[in-house]
Structures are given as structure tokens and as C-alpha cells.
Amino acid sequence: MAPKILAVINQKGGVGKSTISVNLAYGLYLKKKRVLLIDLDPQAHSSCIYCPEIPQTETISLAFTDKKLNLKSIIMKAVVGNEMIDTLNIIPSNIKLATVVEQISGTLYREKILKNHLDKIADAYDYIVLDCPPTLGILAINAIYCSNSIIVPTSFGRYSLDGMADLLGAVKEIKEGQSYNFFVLKNLYEKRNSQTNKYVNEQLESLKDNTFATTIRKNEAINQAQITNLPVQVFNSASKGAQDFDLLTEEVIHNA
């Protein structure tokens, strides 16, 4: 059975894509799913959480520059604390990924590169989570093309929804002829910011059928978990952050 491939994407920075990718992947693992997290962001924030030492060469960059690559050769077991996890894997990134765009600029069907690799390991995973870069370039296009669910995190800032219409239009064009799910995920919610919250919710009214019921609250445990290179569910399983990601994981399993 083919895995569900989830692209976590927004061309705006600071909306929590990597935080969501890391904790959603761990949430799916806790639900007994076989999970692969692929870091497509040269900033490598997801890689920092699950890889004590990020490789210099065995990264996702190779998937774009070596057509004959066996993808399994760059898949690593995620490390949480001191434990290597068999059913939570990661393909890490590093800053060198930023140069890949130039290297493949003349490659035919370059939007299909990632899909061609993932098709060969389809039976190994239940879920593949793609942590996308904050630009709508060829890396993000590859992620959109091969995914069956698009998750767009948005924060509760005044300008947090800028570019949403452009992103939706790009996704529709890239996925032409393919079926896919699309979800907005409200992140970094603070109850005290009532006017901003009201504004964001009003702006999302037209997308209410495509918005997750779960909202990820701004929570210090999530920040502290990142500092200690842990998913929030491990750092503090009783925290609001862990509770929110458990609810999100359930929604993803049932709807995405």
C-alpha cells in the first residue's frame, strides 16, 4: 500500500513548518506508524532534532543530483535522546542543498525527481512527511508534486496570510490532473490576542472546510523541546504542546 505523503509548506518563514514536521512525524510514530521525515530545507532545522551529527554528503541533495541513487543509502534512523528508532527515519539536509537548484536547472522533468525516488521505497512507510523550504522553488515543487496532502501552517500575525492565494494557485497548477487534500493549520495561537485572532479567523472563513479543527497553541514546552533537540512529546508529554500535536496527529490519520 502506498504511503500517505504530507508536504508541510508555506513560502512565508516563521510559521513553524519545521516544528510541525518534527512533532507530527513523532506523533505518527507514537501511533505505531512507519514514518519517514525528509528535510527539504537547507536550514536543516528538522535534521538538527533527529540527527546528532548531520552528514556532510549523505543528505537529500544526493537524491536530486544522482539519478541512480538508492534512496535507502541516505535514510537514517531518527535519534531521540540516546535511542535510535527503527520506525521513525529521516533523510537529513544541510546548507549544501541550496546549491542543488542551480545544478538541476537544465534537468528534464526535474519536478518529478523526488517522486521517482519515493516510488521505489513506497512499501517501507505508512507516512512520509516533507519539511519544505520557505520558497516556492524546485524543491517545494517536487514536494507538492509527489504529495497527496498539502499542509499549510499559518500563524496569527497580521501578515501571516499574505501569499496564501498565490500558494493555493501554484498547488492547483502543479497538481493538475492529480487528486490531493489541502489543509490549513493554525499555529502559534495566543488567546490574549483576541483582535488578531478574530482577523485571522475571518480571513480563513472561506477555507473553513479545509482548516484543521486542531489549533497549535504557542507553548514554552515546544520552544524548550527544540533547544534540547527533542520532540515536544518527549520533552514534556503533559504539556499543551504535546496535547495539541496528539490531536493534530489524530486528525491527520483520519482526514489527510
What residues fall within each predicted segment?
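P-loop NTP-binding core
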Residues: 1-256
